[in-house]
Amino acid sequence: MVKLPPLSLYIHIPWCVQKCPYCDFNSHALKGEVPHDDYVQHLLNDLDNDVAYAQGREVKTIFIGGGTPSLLSGPAMQTLLDGVRARLPLAADAEITMEANPGTVEADRFVDYQRAGVNRISIGVQSFSEEKLKRLGRIHGPQEAKRAAKLASGLGLRSFNLDLMHGLPDQSLEEALGDLRQAIELNPPHLSWYQLTIEPNTLFGSRPPVLPDDDALWDIFEQGHQLLTAAGYQQYETSAYAKPGYQCQHNLNYWRFGDYIGIGCGAHGKVTFPDGRILRTTKTRHPRGFMQGRYLESQRDVEATDKPFEFFMNRFRLLEAAPRVEFIAYTGLCEDVIRPQLDEAIAQGYLTECADYWQITEHGKLFLNSLLELFLAE
């Protein structure tokens, strides 16, 4: 018998006003109106099929991602979250996050979302530079980003996050730090600060822009990290910074190899069973197929040989120590199966080990891919 990990719920809203050239998420440019009521009903039907996966557990966190969830109307959000509460037991202090694009933010709608149960908003700012926002294909300007942050702050939500990117096309060190300073000035409890990466199957993938070189990227990261630390933010994951007590609980559950039910277009799920079986689910990507009632695209059991890599893949993105008991409890494997890999990781200086946990080192963070490759199945 394995210990069932904490459970989260991910809900995907697939539409955007327009597709950004760097984005490889499952998002679809909107043609006409959002089918609010129909899509919400399909989401709840999809959840009905998966509700047994909860296995009596409370849902600790909900994350509504996209696409652009802030295109959903207030009443539709109310129906959606009421429907979730009717089907699943929510923890009394459940964190309920939704993503918002500053270009789609309306004060009344934010209030409606809060009334529906949303207590944390993640705002996709990306940059405060008009020129950089245009290059990124964003539909908002710097002032709209600041207005959205101030609106979120004024609602008295449990928390809000600003998403910010660095390493943008032709971005100088001073421009990157300028973005960070403006974000810090808005005093978000949480900041996600991540490097732009060029993904295949995107506009940038087919026509790559000129990005800062590795030396410039390192300077941006190093000085940006110092700026955030001085402002009271603690880094707890590769790209995540928070004031004390404001870490994103939903993402922490992903990174700690927790379980999550995924509903909506292209949503992924991971479910553990008492016998140690781990099931991964993927939902139909395209809204057309999904809204014809074809919700499940595929599902597969995680092979025992793949479990160590899957456990460590996200665990080692976190700066906190990884408890050794969790590896055994959440994978159903004993440590003996990875002892040679652990010894190699320790010998390479990637990890330290004590009686209770493994801790990734500074060297391990720099060579994270090399560390993870040790745990890949032969």
From Swiss-Prot:
Primary subcellular site in the record, as a coarse category: cytoplasm
UniProt keyword Chaperone, yes or no: yes
Keyword list, A-Z: 4Fe-4S, Chaperone, Cytoplasm, Heme, Iron, Iron-sulfur, Metal-binding, S-adenosyl-L-methionine
Repeat found in the keyword field: no
Cofactor requirements of the protein: [4Fe-4S] cluster
Location(s) in or outside the cell: Cytoplasm
Pfam families found in the cross-reference section: HemN_C, Radical_SAM
InterPro entries: Aldolase_TIM, Coproporphyrinogen-III_oxidase, Elp3/MiaA/NifB-like_rSAM, HemN_C, HemW-like, rSAM
GO molecular function: 4 iron, 4 sulfur cluster binding; coproporphyrinogen oxidase activity; heme binding; metal ion binding; protein homodimerization activity
Coiled coil (residue ranges): none
Residues noted as binding S-adenosyl-L-methionine 1 in the record, renumbered to the chain: Y10, G66, E99
Example GO BP: porphyrin-containing compound biosynthetic process
Binding site residues for [4Fe-4S] cluster: C16, C20, C23
Highest taxon of the lineage: Bacteria
Phenotypic effect of disruption: Very slightly decreased anaerobic growth in minimal medium with KNO(3) and glycerol.
Domain Radical SAM core residue range list: 1-237
Residues that hold S-adenosyl-L-methionine 2 according to the record: G67, T68, Q126, R138, D163
Any one of the GO CC terms: cytoplasm
Subunit structure: Binding of the [4Fe-4S] cofactor promotes dimerization.
Family, similarity comment: Belongs to the anaerobic coproporphyrinogen-III oxidase family. HemW subfamily.
Family matches, as PANTHER family: COPROPORPHYRINIGEN III OXIDASE, RADICAL S-ADENOSYL METHIONINE DOMAIN-CONTAINING PROTEIN 1, MITOCHONDRIAL
Miscellaneous remark of the record: Might carry two S-adenosyl-L-methionine binding sites with only one binding to the iron-sulfur cluster.
Function per UniProt: Probably acts as a heme chaperone, transferring heme to the NarI subunit of the respiratory enzyme nitrate reductase; transfer may be stimulated by NADH. Binds one molecule of heme per monomer, possibly covalently. Heme binding is not affected by either [4Fe-4S] or S-adenosyl-L-methionine (SAM)-binding. Does not have coproporphyrinogen III dehydrogenase activity in vitro. Binds 1 [4Fe-4S] cluster. The cluster is coordinated with 3 cysteines and an exchangeable S-adenosyl-L-methionine.
Protein name: Heme chaperone HemW
Species lineage: Bacteria, Pseudomonadati, Pseudomonadota, Gammaproteobacteria, Enterobacterales
